[in-house]
């Protein structure tokens, strides 16, 4: 029995924040079953990973893509378990072309100006004979690179595709490893006007009611779509990236220890979809925004999470991945996922201007700006505005 390591290796997001006025013409599309299934899976996986304390960041689209390629080579009950766990459509005969179509849509205009989005796949052959039809399928539908190599070749591919942000993904490979399936997402988004560094000040971030850390907090005042839900005790803010194709969605509980109170917003795909729709139709309001400057790095062995979600046979010697090599001698030994997120003031050349505003006395002023003070734990998503695909999601509990 040979094995193969499924390395869902890297989801990198170098997100450089700045302010941009959102447009009111966000393009809407009919949500397809693949997007809905991917969102449902993202929230299931989040529920598994969130049990650990601390910060959390991962790319559900990266995980779904890599396992989508693996699913294409699964057969019988192994395939059924993968389909159910990943929330793929019950009729998955068109899954590969649907993934191709969705990825192409996500990449459309993805590298225009200061926005960069790369989604890349690969199959590294270490010792196995792989079916030509499987390799052809990966090339045709996932635009996968196919090459032979060892752990050094794999790590070099990782370093190249992530622009050096992740120098390695694996320390070693078992001599029984047959092949490694790879997926990487690299994202760099900036805004037209960055946060001014002069307005970044060290201030408390409250980890709990009794504990806090002093961290750099960025500040700006601008118009953004904002929802204040007093009944469920949270605020949600949508920060569009330049080009208005991708957005950063923040969900901030009113209470410092209130992350559980916003659970209903992310308990299933329908509830999250409803919130995203509300955000995209919410009128822009003047917002005084305070956001921590931070960097997140995550490294997950996802096998335990998938087993808890009901996927078992794929990790056993009885697994059926005969669609990959024509035999029943492959099983998954490892699912490794790394993710990096950077948020700071940089991302574009900045210009400065000074305005001296002379006001007449007794002029009726507009309403004061709303406050969005992200000085305690919050949830966040990086999503595509048109398809509502979740590229990245996470939880910030300590930016220090």
Residue ranges and their predicted role:
Residues 37, 61, 176-177, 374:
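A generic structural signal for residues located within well-ordered alpha-helices
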Residues 53, 92-262, 275-364:
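Non-catalytic, conformational "gating/processing" segments within enzyme and secreted inhibitor domains
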Residues 5, 60, 253-256, 290-292, ...:
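Proline-rich low-complexity regions
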Residues 269-272:
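Well-ordered, non-membrane alpha-helical segments in soluble/globular domains
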Residues 334-400:
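C-terminal soluble interaction/assembly domains
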Residues 1-12, 16-148, 385, 396:
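Detector for small/aliphatic-rich hydrophobic stretches
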